[in-house]
């Protein structure tokens, strides 16, 4: 159903007063008011749509949806989507073409109806020359203002069409068109009140309506004020011939139009007239601009004389009102005979076909509009009518609101008689007519009053037949009259309408021209271009046919006037257009330029902001870095200050510590005793636990054996009742086959005997047979009773087992939950304890590092005081070294004890694991036996074998998971033990140098940790055992449950079988039982064989696993033994080396005495003979003495020389760069040949590195010497006396002295040369200072090592026959063997140097052995082999692989980073003092040999002291 009935006024501007005066004044009849009730009755009579119409409606609706058209313009939805539309009316006169194009646009904004204003106001306002208000939306598209029409289907028959139409013709009344005051275009809209709120598209199909021509058009139909001048002169130029009076009042006959219908059906058409109106809605009027009339001429009188009819389906004469139709459905209509039809020529821009949605447009180039508007062209074809009466037409003016509400229908018929006279001026040509389709649809029909509609249709069709006849007569008369008129004015206007440009009309009729006839050729030349561009192909043909006629004076004057006016107007419009276009272009260019400038400015501003931000960030970063550096420096100063204070406090408490050392030792001994006691208690506790575990296992074993025995007895009793031979097979598995054969043979004999007896019994009398049957029956009853008793006993036993299993399961669940809760609590407590310990360890580490730094700084502050108290400190140092050696020895003993304890714990753990494994194996075996016993009872289940296999697989999986879990727990326990061990060692190292209270606290903490660890291990073991027991119990309960279900099922089956067996014959039952027994026995034998095979396989598998575990354990034990053996061998080797060194030391001391005496003699002689120093001789002498002293130093035993290494820290720490250093001045020699001591700032600070020369018979001095060479403990790292971070090798700069080769001494056979090689480091040899020196020399030499490494072989020979061949040290080759004490001093020096070289060879060989196999490490010397730092990392990885991880994947590219990492790891985790600074090494072109030897010697000592 359609919702609304549209009605509005076409708003056009009023004509000027002059034009109104020229037009004849005619009265305007008031509009007829139609009440609301009458309108409701009329709308209720509309018929309902049929199925065919609904299908067409769907099709049209789809087309409109595809063309972006909305539903109903009358139902508050604009079908044009608020787009502009174009309606065109074109009239062709004679052979010329006159086209009138009307274009109007409407905005998107809709105005409400004037609901409260009565329709009579329209008449009053119109009579006063004012514009009436619009009763409908003020902004509607022009296509909505044209007419609502619909298309019908030509295939529908006439009867259906008559039946479908209802209640519309009753609204038609005769009306005449007022030519001057055309009040409105009347548009009727209907609404069915039942479905007025529907939002559907209610218009099934549009239909085009034909419209007749009219030769008169009021100027005021156009809303554009700019077009007023066009129509002012038009009325005077158009001739309006008069018509006879009898034709004015002839009724108009409505005829059907083929394929058109008001409501979309196929049988009926309904038309609404288009009336030109002076007043139309604001912003919704038809807008005709002058541009539209430049291409085709327009005849106003012809348009005003147009009439509107309803056409029947059978009518051949078609009248088309201005209407929009689809291009695909536009078909020319054949006019009746002798009737001229004016053709509408349309031109459509193909480029706008998509926007026009398939409608024909007359605009060749439509005006540009906004994107929200569309362009719609309307094509009109009108036919001539005899008069202008509207007797059967739609009422003139109607108003209604959207709700069908308060306003009544009204109409104003046009009765102007003069309008008919204008039809004489209209001529038509028999060209093809074109119909167009409107996209305005009316809704569906009502379903009410169908019978009344049929009756009313019959009356309408009778009236239409009469109208048809009258129309034919009128057409004939009109055709004749038009033909005469055409002949009269054909020659006059032939050339006038050749062009399509509209002319501006004047207010007066032009007079006849007296000028000469216009030259046609000149006119054609002047206007041919505009005519060719404006007209269509058909119009050109018509114009060419009519160019032959000669114009008159009247037409010439008219043409001249029109030509001038048109030419001026066209030029003005072209100028305006060009100017507007130029302005638009300029504006666009300006906008583009401004946009580019704006974008460039924005980009510039953004770049500046970004640059400022970056600069600010950079400055802020620099400021922050500077602040951090200041904070760091302030922090360092504060730390130095605190360190000084702490050093003072430590020095004050030093005496107190010495006093408390003895007490600490007593407490340590007590602690050791307490530790041993705790270990003993722990062992006792473990022994008790082991005994309790053994007792528990024994008890469980006894219980299980008892249960097994009872079960076996029960099974044996059952088997004895059925068959005695089966018991022998079960008890003696090895003789199973043999006994089975015997049993089968026995059964065969029994059967044979029974058969024989039976045969004999049959031969006997019948009494014997009856007796035998009676005996058989009694036997069967006894067996049945025994079987029932057995089943009852089994049932009771099963119920008891079920109850016990349920109780066990509940208890197990409770225990499991408790254990889980306790485990979670323990885990949380352990995590907290671990975090606490980690935090404490980190704090202690930081404190130790700070303490170390403080000690370093304190050494510098104590420099002056230590100089004054050198002798006292020396004595204290000796005591301290002795005490440290004692502490180290005790620590070593403690470490050995701890190692033994750990080994014992490991053995205990392995023993416990072995016991646990055996217990689990035993439990598994017992479980397997129980499973086998249960399996034997399941004799009749064929699928039992598969189920048991699945259970065994599941049990194996659970066992595997349990073992993995135990292994994981073991690994965690081992890691925890290792971590505890490391923590304990670190605490012990810190406790060695701490106070008494600290030592006691750490001992207590250690005891507590040990106790917690033991408790943790115990808890873990208990939890593991509980979890394993719980898993086994759960598994056993599940199996028992499955067994109960299976037994219940078997019992049910047994009962059924017994019921069946009772029905069978007794004899056959006995035979079947015997067969069943034999078969069951055979199956049992097979199952038993399979079980034995499976058991054998399981045992073999367990044996293999046990063997593998034993092999692993054996390998571990062997490795441990090898390690212990290696350590013993190393210890023995060290002892031998120590003995050898002691012997060498004795010899060296003897040589040293003699050598000193000779030196003193030589020096005295030189002082007497020489007063001036000869540089060359002095340098050579100093070098020789330095070599001798260095050899003596390096010839010390391992234990003795190691103490000197720690005192050489001044060689590397705090060294400044050699580059740019100011060369020192040469110092004068004293009388004794030494330099001035006060000019050597570090000479006093160097601690003597040689031992005291004892007397030959002084045993006490020998003992003191041996104590001096003892190793210091790792925990306490003391700096040497007089240590200063800025100290160097006593501030000697090799670049300050130009070394020269000296002459060989005459008394030596040793060749001493100074060689240099490119890219080799400079080496420095320090002068060893004796405790009781007689002569002090500072010697230096500069040599380069050979490219080949020294000999790595170390051969120990007796002292009397030992020789050192092929040794090299610092580039000085020596082949001189050792000589007895009577040899000259030069030979003694050479022998001492060879001994020193042998010590370096030992160190080098040890380093090679430790780094063997490491990729990228090849140690050949003490310089170039260590340059990249990888060798240091290899040493750290050798003794602590966990610190570095995988050696192959570890990055080793950065040299300085390798130095820092290796030195820090060695100091922190191995206890090797970092004598070498990585930053100083980075500045040197190569390694410094002596510094590297010092560090590596310290590394060697620490590793040997640690037992590696």
Curated annotation (Swiss-Prot):
Listed SMART domains: CH
Residue ranges occupied by any Calponin-homology (CH) domain in the UniProt entry: 1397-1504
Pfam families on file: CH
Compositional bias segments (type: Basic residues): 1216-1225
Coiled-coil stretches: 455-498
Name of this protein: Calponin homology domain-containing protein DDB_G0272472
Domain of life: Eukaryota
Polar residues bias locations: 380-391, 439-452, 1362-1374
Organism in which the protein naturally occurs: Dictyostelium discoideum
Record's compositionally biased regions (Basic and acidic residues): 208-222, 337-346, 362-371, 465-498, 1036-1164, 1226-1235
InterPro entries xrefs: CH_dom, CH_dom_sf
């Amino acid at each position: 159903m359609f919702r609304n009935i549209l009605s509005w006024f076409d708003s056009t501007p009023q004509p000027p007063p002059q034009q109104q005066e020229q037009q004849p004044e005619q009265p305007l009849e008031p509009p007829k008011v139609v009440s609301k009730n009458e309108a409701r009755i009329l709308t209720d009579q509309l018929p309902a749509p049929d199925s065919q119409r609904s299908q067409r409606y769907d099709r049209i609706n789809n087309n409109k949806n595809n063309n972006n058209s909305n539903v109903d313009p009358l139902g508050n939805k604009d079908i044009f989507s608020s787009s502009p539309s174009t309606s065109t009316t074109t009239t062709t006169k004679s052979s010329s073409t006159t086209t009138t194009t009307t274009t109007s646009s409407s905005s998107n904004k809709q105005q409400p109806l004037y609901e409260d204003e009565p329709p009579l106001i329209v008449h009053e306002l119109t009579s006063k020359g004012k514009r009436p208000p619009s009763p409908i939306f003020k902004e509607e598209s022009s296509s909505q203002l044209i007419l609502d029409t619909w298309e019908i289907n030509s295939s529908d028959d006439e009867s259906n069409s008559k039946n479908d139409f209802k209640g519309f013709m009753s609204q038609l009344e005769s009306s005449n068109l007022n030519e001057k005051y055309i009040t409105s275009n009347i548009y009727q809209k209907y609404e069915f009140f039942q479905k007025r709120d529907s939002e559907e598209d209610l218009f099934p199909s549009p239909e085009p309506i034909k419209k007749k021509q009219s030769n008169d058009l009021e100027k005021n139909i156009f809303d554009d004020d700019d077009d007023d001048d066009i129509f002012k002169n038009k009325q005077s130029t158009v001739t309006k011939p008069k018509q006879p009076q009898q034709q004015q009042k002839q009724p108009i006959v409505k005829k059907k139009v083929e394929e058109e219908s008001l409501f979309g059906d196929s049988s009926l058409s309904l038309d609404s007239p288009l009336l030109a109106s002076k007043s139309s809605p604001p912003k919704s009027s038809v807008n005709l601009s002058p541009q539209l009339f430049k291409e085709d001429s327009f005849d106003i009188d012809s348009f005003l004389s147009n009439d509107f009819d309803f056409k029947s389906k059978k009518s051949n004469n078609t009248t088309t009102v201005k209407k929009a139709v689809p291009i695909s459905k536009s078909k020319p209509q054949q006019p009746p005979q002798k009737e001229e039809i004016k053709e509408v020529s349309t031109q459509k821009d193909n480029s706008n076909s998509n926007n026009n949605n398939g409608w024909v447009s007359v605009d060749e180039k439509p005006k540009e509009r906004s994107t929200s508007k569309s362009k719609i062209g309307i094509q009109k074809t009108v036919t001539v009518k005899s008069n202008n009466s509207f007797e059967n037409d739609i009422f003139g003016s109607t108003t209604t609101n959207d709700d069908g509400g308060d306003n009544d229908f009204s109409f104003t018929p046009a009765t102007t008689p003069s309008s008919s006279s204008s039809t004489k001026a209209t001529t038509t040509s028999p060209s093809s007519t074109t119909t167009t389709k409107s996209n305005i649809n009316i809704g569906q029909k009502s379903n009410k009053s169908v019978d009344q509609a049929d009756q009313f249709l019959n009356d309408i069709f009778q009236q239409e037949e009469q109208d048809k006849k009258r129309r034919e007569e009128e057409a004939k008369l009109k055709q004749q009259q038009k033909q005469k008129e055409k002949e009269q004015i054909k020659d006059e206007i032939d050339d006038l309408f050749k062009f399509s440009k509209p002319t501006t009309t004047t207010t007066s009729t032009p007079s006849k021209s007296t000028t000469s006839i216009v030259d046609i050729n000149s006119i054609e030349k002047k206007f041919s271009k505009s005519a060719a561009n404006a007209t269509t192909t058909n119009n050109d043909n018509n114009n060419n046919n009519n160019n032959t006629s000669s114009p008159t004076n009247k037409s010439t004057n008219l043409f001249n006037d029109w030509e001038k006016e048109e030419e001026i107007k066209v030029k003005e419009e072209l100028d305006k257009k060009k100017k507007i276009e130029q302005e638009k272009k300029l504006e666009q260019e300006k906008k583009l330029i401004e946009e580019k400038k704006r974008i460039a400015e924005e980009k510039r501003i953004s770049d500046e902001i970004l640059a400022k931000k970056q600069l600010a960030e950079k400055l802020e970063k620099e400021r922050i870095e500077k602040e951090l550096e200041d904070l760091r420096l302030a922090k360092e100063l504060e730390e130095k200050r605190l360190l000084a204070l702490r050093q003072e406090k430590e020095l004050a408490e030093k005496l107190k510590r010495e006093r408390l050392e003895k007490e600490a030792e007593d407490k340590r001994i007590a602690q050791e005793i307490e530790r041993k006691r705790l270990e003993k208690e722990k062992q006792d506790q473990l022994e008790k636990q082991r005994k309790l575990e053994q007792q528990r296992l024994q008890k469980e074993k006894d219980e299980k054996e008892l249960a097994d025995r009872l079960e076996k007895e029960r099974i044996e009793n059952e088997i004895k009742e059925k068959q005695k031979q089966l018991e022998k097979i079960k008890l003696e598995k090895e003789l199973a086959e043999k006994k089975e054969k015997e049993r089968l043979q026995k059964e065969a004999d029994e059967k044979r005997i029974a058969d024989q007896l039976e045969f004999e019994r049959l031969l006997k009398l019948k009494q014997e047979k009856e007796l035998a049957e009676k005996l058989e029956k009694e036997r069967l009853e006894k067996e049945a009773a025994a079987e029932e008793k057995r089943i009852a006993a089994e049932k009771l036993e099963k119920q008891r087992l079920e109850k016990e299993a349920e109780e066990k399961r509940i208890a197990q669940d409770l225990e499991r939950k408790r254990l889980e809760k306790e485990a979670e609590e323990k885990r949380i407590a352990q995590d907290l304890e671990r975090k606490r310990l980690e935090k404490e360890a980190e704090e202690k580490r930081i404190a130790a590092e700070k303490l170390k730094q403080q000690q370093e700084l304190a050494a510098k502050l104590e420099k002056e005081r230590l100089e004054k108290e050198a002798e006292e400190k020396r004595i204290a140092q000796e005591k301290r070294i002795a005490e440290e050696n004692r502490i180290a020895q005790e620590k070593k003993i403690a470490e050995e004890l701890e190692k033994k304890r750990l080994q014992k714990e490991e053995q205990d753990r392995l023993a416990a694991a072995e016991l646990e494994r055996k217990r689990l194996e035993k439990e598994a075996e017992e479980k397997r036996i129980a499973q086998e016993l249960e399996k034997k009872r399941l004799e009749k289940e064929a699928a039992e074998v598969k189920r048991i296999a699945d259970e065994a697989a599941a049990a194996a999986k659970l066992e595997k998971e349990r073992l993995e879990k135990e292994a994981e727990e073991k690994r965690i326990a081992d890691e925890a033990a290792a971590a505890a061990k490391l923590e304990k060692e670190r605490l012990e190292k810190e406790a060695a140098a701490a106070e008494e209270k600290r030592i006691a606290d750490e001992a207590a903490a250690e005891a507590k940790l040990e106790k917690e660890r033991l408790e943790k291990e115990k808890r873990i073991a208990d939890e593991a055992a509980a979890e394993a027991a719980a898993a086994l119990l759960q598994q056993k309960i599940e199996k028992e449950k499955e067994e109960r279900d299976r037994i219940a099922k078997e019992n049910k089956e047994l009962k059924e079988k017994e019921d069946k067996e009772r029905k069978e014959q007794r004899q056959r039952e006995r035979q079947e039982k015997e067969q069943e027994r034999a078969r069951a026995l055979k199956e049992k034998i097979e199952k038993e064989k399979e079980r034995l095979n499976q058991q054998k396989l399981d045992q073999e598998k367990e044996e293999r696993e046990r063997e593998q575990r034993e092999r692993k354990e054996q390998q571990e034990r062997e490795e441990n033994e090898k390690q212990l053996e290696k350590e013993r061998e190393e210890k023995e080797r060290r002892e031998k080396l120590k003995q050898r060194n002691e012997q060498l030391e004795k010899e060296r001391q003897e040589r040293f005495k003699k050598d000193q005496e000779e030196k003193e003699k030589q020096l005295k002689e030189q002082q007497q003979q020489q007063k001036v120093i000869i540089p060359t001789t002095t340098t050579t002498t100093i070098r020789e003495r330095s070599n001798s002293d260095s050899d003596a130093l390096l010839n010390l035993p391992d234990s003795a020389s190691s103490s000197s290494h720690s005192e050489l820290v001044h060689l590397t720490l705090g060294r400044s760069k050699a580059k740019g250093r100011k060369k020192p001045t040469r110092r004068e020699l004293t009388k004794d040949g030494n330099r001035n001591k006060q000019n050597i700032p570090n000479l006093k600070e160097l601690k003597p590195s040689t031992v005291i020369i004892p007397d030959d018979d002084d045993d006490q001095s020998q003992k003191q010497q041996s104590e001096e060479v003892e190793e210091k403990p790792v925990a306490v790292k003391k700096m040497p006396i007089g240590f200063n971070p800025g100290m160097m090798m006593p501030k000697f700069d090799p670049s300050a002295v130009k070394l020269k080769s000296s002459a060989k001494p005459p008394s030596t056979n040793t060749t001493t040369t100074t060689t240099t090689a490119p890219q080799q480091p400079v080496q420095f040899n320090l002068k060893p200072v004796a405790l009781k020196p007689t002569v002090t020399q500072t010697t230096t030499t500069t040599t380069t090592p050979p490219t080949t490494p020294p000999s790595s072989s170390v051969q120990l020979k007796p002292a009397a026959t030992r020789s050192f061949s092929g040794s090299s040290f610092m580039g000085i080759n020596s082949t001189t063997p050792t000589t007895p004490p009577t040899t000259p001093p030069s030979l003694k020096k050479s022998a001492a140097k060879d001994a020193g070289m042998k010590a370096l060879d030992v160190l080098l060989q040890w380093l090679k052995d430790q780094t063997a196999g490491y990729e990228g490490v090849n140690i050949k010397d003490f310089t170039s082999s260590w340059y990249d730092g990888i060798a240091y990392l290899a040493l750290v990885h050798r003794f602590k692989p966990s610190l570095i991880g995988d050696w192959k994947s570890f990055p080793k590219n950065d040299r300085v980073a390798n130095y820092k990492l290796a030195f820090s790891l060695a100091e922190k985790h191995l206890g090797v003092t970092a004598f070498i600074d990585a930053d100083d090494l980075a500045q040197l072109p190569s390694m410094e040999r002596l510094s590297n030897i010092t560090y590596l010697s310290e590394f060697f000592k620490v590793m040997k002291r640690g037992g590696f």
